[in-house]
Amino acid sequence: MKDNTKDSGEELINIDEKGNPIEKENQEKKPKSNSFTKIIIAIILCLIISVAIYFFFKCKHKKKTVFDETTLKNLKLKNRVFFGPISHTAEKIETIVKNDVALVITEGAVVGDYTFSKLQPEGPFRIDSDEYIPEIKKLAEIAHKYNAYIILDLVHQGLISVEQPVYSPSGGKGLINTEIDSKPMTKEDILRIEDYFVQGAIRAKKAGYDGVEIHGAQLTLVSLFSSKKFNKRTDDYGGSDENRARFIVEIVKKIREAVGDDMIISAKIDAPDKDNEITESGFITTGKLLQEAGLDLMEVSGPNPIRQGEDPFFYNDTKKIAEILKIPVICIGGIKKYEQADYILKNSNIEYIAMSRELLKQPDIVKKWYLNK
């Protein structure tokens, strides 16, 4: 066997098939060719990765528009415009949904301890008995007829009740009928009223609604628990931010267990408010706990739904919580123009805008926006 080295320790010399030595210069040509190929492949891979990253971030950060089609859980929405809840508007829903609103949130439907008197001549919307299912079912059928979706707002009147029984977290006078005293809620009252909300959600599902909203704003009963002014409790439902949120969180959990995963569960909560001692930390904590409890959608309002100041008046608080939560958030309050809606969507994580009074004034405003955009 022929040795291809001169002596031990000397440089290894390769030979060709005929036994002739291969010059060192020729030996180095192949590695150079391999290195060049590897460089080209690396450049191509870098270009592919760069293009992929570019399109990923372009899609991820694409500016939202009013007329985007979106998916809310299992709902395919035709745009980002909702009709927000406002009292005594059930008969106007058809006029609104046939003009291209994507989703309707009804006026508050009382879940229990219903009261009525001459102080409320029209009376509130009701869902505290199965006998009201046929009535509310008509609204769901109207919404679906026009390719819109509908959510039933569930409310307990609390201190805005005008006759007994009047319940509150810690007692006090009524807010509408100031001559009556409210009853501080016992644990049994809390559990009973939580079940009222659950039964209301079950009835909404039977009536064909796409979801329900827990009304936890505007000084209704659930709203009062978030307020240090009205909630002086020292048990599990008062004191800390987490405890003040417990009532609405338990309602959401129980509703989810009762109606399953397909139904949308939304909540309307109060923005921070100095006069009613609703803190920013409480506002944020409530949002986080509701998200953990299985909430699908959130709307931000306030103890006083009609605020003074620049429109849209809940935008800053809504923007803040939308940056923290992963669930979609609705901005409502004082939105009247396309430019406002467009700005809100393009400059925040807010997913949807809702109008109430403006849609009542101009039921075809969404169509006008589309034609003039």
Feature names for model-found ranges:
Residues 59-373:
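Flavin-dependent oxidoreductase catalytic cores
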Residues 52-60:
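Juxtamembrane cytosolic interface motif at the C-terminal end of transmembrane helices
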Residues 26-40:
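Short, low-complexity patches enriched in S/T/P/G
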Residues 42-51:
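Core hydrophobic alpha-helical transmembrane segments of single-pass membrane proteins
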Residues 6-9, 34-36, 51, 267:
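Compositionally biased regions
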Residues 4, 29-31, 46, 55:
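Compositionally biased, low-complexity segments
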Residues 1-26:
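N-terminal targeting leaders characterized by basic, low-complexity, disordered sequences
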